[in-house]
Amino acid sequence: KNTDDGAKIYTPLTLKLYDWWVLGVSNRLAWGCPTKEHLLPHFLEHLGNNHLDIGVGTGFYLTHVPESSLISLMDLNEASLNAASTRAGESKIKHKINHDVFEPYPAALHGQFDSISMFYLLHCLPGNISTKSCVIRNAAQALTDDGTLYGATILGDGVVHNSFGQKLMRIYNQKGIFSNTKDSEEGLTHILSEHFENVKTKVQGTVVMFSASGKK
């Protein structure tokens, strides 16, 4: 497996285009889950005071957090970390962590965060949904006992993609940007339930928004 394949797409140039293409065009027209109507409210609903954002993109969501928030960023891509940090405002950023989510987190991060977000991370990770269980486990270790893991991911199974979505799914999976053709809501619920007592999912278009708390 190579986590790098999903991260390579994010160069300084593509990050500038990301908001327009992914958060604007694709979310609305390909995936049927408009950012400002669905994903941004989901992000803010579960945000805790001490927050870790994993797979940070351009930092779009972080521009909407309260000034008092303490934010840490985790990504495999330095360009993403720097872009998100600059955009969110360096004063809000507590840590920038360059880390592969398949690997256990440093002990110093265990039990630290009130909330952890994974927005559009899981569908970019290599392998099927069951192989991504360790990603959930590693994140759970970094939460406080009453912390919440939440996010959103694009599904490939159990949803009906429109022609635009089908085309993007085919291209992105062929290029290794996505690895989600067999990802389902049921499969996601299963890997979340392995590590959390309380799991909620909601499908909007071809995107599933999830939250999980009560870590086991």
Question: Where in this protein do the model-derived segments appear?
Answer:
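Conserved class I S-adenosyl-L-methionine
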Residues: 1-47, 60
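Class I SAM-dependent methyltransferase SAM/SAH-binding core
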Residues: 50-105
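Short amphipathic alpha-helix with an adjacent loop that forms part of the alpha/beta core around
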Residues: 105-111
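A conserved beta-strand element that flanks and buttresses the S-adenosyl-L-methionine
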Residues: 117-120
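A short, conserved alpha-helix within the catalytic core of class I
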Residues: 125-138
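Short glycine-dipeptide loop
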Residues: 143-149
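C-terminal alpha-helical "lid/dimerization" subdomain adjacent to the S-adenosyl-L-methionine
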Residues: 150-201
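Core SAM-dependent methyltransferase catalytic element
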Residues: 195-216
